[in-house]
UniProtKB/Swiss-Prot annotation:
Keyword set includes Ribonucleoprotein: no
SUPFAM superfamilies per UniProt: Adenine nucleotide alpha hydrolases-like, Class I glutamine amidotransferase-like, GMP synthetase C-terminal dimerisation domain
Catalytic activity entry: XMP + L-glutamine + ATP + H2O = GMP + L-glutamate + AMP + diphosphate + 2 H(+)
Top-level EC class as recorded in UniProt: ligase
Active site: 86 (nucleophile), 181, 183
Subunit structure comment from the entry: Homodimer.
Protein known as: GMP synthase [glutamine-hydrolyzing]
Highest taxon listed in the record's lineage: Bacteria
Record-listed E.C. numbers: 6.3.5.2
């Protein structure tokens, strides 16, 4: 009998670091299941989760403050290996009898760590060799406090020029602490260090693979829904597309996909969705032409949040009407992913002990009485894309740039009109087409066009024209929390501008947005 892919599992306790989700993603990439819980989890909950090992993540607080977060005492008596990272190392040191103090030399950025003792955590890990023969590592630091004394039973494993305790270890108890961040790519050997902990020290097997995730999801969905029918709101986005493919494998024609064309999609997107999922993959899919309904409800509204709510509410109305026609549908499938689940719980610095449910379809009415099927709720976005590839979905679709839920409704500034949407989708298609042609699309993180509700004078031949303005937006980012505007070649921008103005009657001027995030947001609305 094959093993459950959740049999070996790592518990990551979150103290509020911006890098905490990165730790979880790195552990998953190694091939081991893990979950992210708040630092104030109870002993009973840890026992219930039954982790193979525990990682204490970083955080913005100071261990020297009396009310700052601490790991539950049970972490140190549970009998499993523990790794503390940055703040996690500091709270481990303080809780086990060592000392922590505010450092006069704060470290933020690259640092060279010298290994001065053997440890299972650093087995076969080095970037270079120092003059004294010790291994050196290039790592990423981000800390103001530092360990001033290690607990009894620990040895100092690594140091930097300004940090005497860069890493510590108690090999007997399998407790380890590192002051740097192995989860970020700037720490070159970071993945190897985490693999040493998860695989060699915790003895986890690599059971968490794309193929095993698919098999597990299909088995669970079959058991959950039995012979019942399931409905899915298919948008053509990554998450709902992967859910559709998983359910199709699990229950075949018992799945009905509802695709709502709201008139706010990208050029030819509706037909592409129908061709791919209906004709190519053979899914049972219903297309609802609802452009007039959405645009009529949006008429006269210019406030961004109000537009979002209208689009969401009309979608619910349309989806509910179609669902009522399917008498035997007992389940609603959703593309909820793990970051949604994390965000729906209280933040790591709050007081929620339990991960709470999250519904990514905004407020479907309770009276619909449909059970929820959420096969992606354990997965990060990169994992969803990988299993999408395994399921046969095309790379270009899975790795397409993000598109907002309200679609062009929030890329048209102010009131939404059919004329504006038609102009915008054509201009956007030209921009994206040229990015692909010039091999730039995969080198930027997100690119799109924005419709501005202002007119500008132009000249076409001998005639004066007075038409609309669009803005090109293109950014580069790692996490979408911060972003820099893309320094696209001037010749390329000129080409895109000329094509848009010459090929689209109704646009007289193209501008390029050179705002970073912060202070601007990536989307305009």
């Amino acid at each position: 009998m094959s093993k459950d892919i959740h049999d070996h599992r790592i518990l990551i306790l979150d103290f509020g670091s911006q890098y905490t989700q990165l730790i979880a993603r790195r552990v998953r990439e190694i091939g081991v299941y893990c979950e992210l819980w708040s630092w104030d989890v109870t002993e009973e909950q840890i026992k219930g989760f039954n982790p193979t090992g525990i990682i204490l993540a970083g955080g913005p607080e100071s261990v020297t403050e009396a009310n700052s977060p601490r790991a539950p005492e049970y972490v140190y008596t549970a009998g499993v290996p523990v790794l503390g990272i940055c703040y996690g190392m500091q709270t481990m040191a303080e809780q086990l009898g060592g000392g922590v103090e505010s450092s006069s030399h704060k470290e933020f950025g690259y640092a060279a760590v010298e290994l001065i003792a053997q440890s299972a955590l650093f087995n076969k890990v080095e970037d270079s060799i120092g003059d004294n023969g010790n291994a050196l590592l290039d790592v990423w630091m981000s800390h103001g406090d530092k360990v001033s004394a290690i607990p009894e039973g620990f040895v100092t494993v690594a140091q930097t020029a300004s940090c005497a305790y860069g890493a510590m270890a108690n090999e007997e108890k399998q407790f380890y602490g590192v002051q740097f961040h192995p989860e970020v790519t700037h720490t070159k050997q970071g993945s190897r260090i985490l693999e040493n902990f998860v695989v060699d020290i915790c003895k986890c097997e690599k059971l968490w693979t794309s193929a095993s995730i698919i098999d597990d999801a299909i088995a669970k969905m079959k058991a959950q829904v039995g012979d019942d029918e399931v409905i899915l709101g298919l948008s053509g986005g990554v998450d709902s597309s992967v859910v559709a493919m998983l359910l199709h494998r699990a229950i075949g024609d018992k799945l009905t996909c509802v695709f709502v064309d709201n008139g706010l999609l990208r050029l030819d997107e509706g037909q592409q969705v129908m061709d791919m999922f209906g004709d190519h993959f053979g899914l049972n899919i219903i297309k609802i032409e609802a452009e007039d309904r959405f645009l009529n409800r949006l008429a006269g509204e210019s406030e961004p949040e109000a537009k979002r709510k209208i689009i969401g509410n009309v979608f619910i109305d349309v989806f509910e009407e179609e669902s009522n026609k399917l008498d035997n549908a007992k389940w609603l499938a959703q593309g909820t992913i793990y970051p949604d689940v994390i965000e729906s719980a209280a933040s790591a610095t709050g007081k929620a002990h339990v991960i709470k449910s999250h519904h990514n379809v905004g407020g479907l009415p309770d009276y619909m009485k449909l059970g929820l099927v959420e096969p992606l709720r354990e997965l990060f976005k990169d994992e969803v894309r990988k299993i999408g590839l395994e399921l046969g979905l095309p790379y270009d679709m899975l790795y397409r740039h993000p598109f907002p839920g309200p679609g062009l409704g929030v890329r048209i500034l102010g009131e939404v009109k059919k004329e504006y949407a038609d102009l915008l989708r054509r201009a956007d298609a030209i921009f994206i087409e040229e990015l692909h042609k010039h091999d730039l699309y995969t080198k930027v993180s997100q690119a799109f066009t924005v419709f501005l509700p202002v007119k500008s004078v132009g000249v076409m031949g001998d005639a004066r024209k007075y038409d609309w303005v669009v803005s090109l937006r293109c950014v580069e980012t790692i996490d979408f929390m911060t972003a820099r505007w893309s320094h696209l070649p001037y010749d390329f921008l000129g080409l895109v501008s000329n094509r848009i103005i010459n090929e689209i009657d109704g646009i007289s001027r193209v501008v390029y947005d050179i705002s970073g995030k912060p202070p601007a947001t990536i989307e305009w609305e």
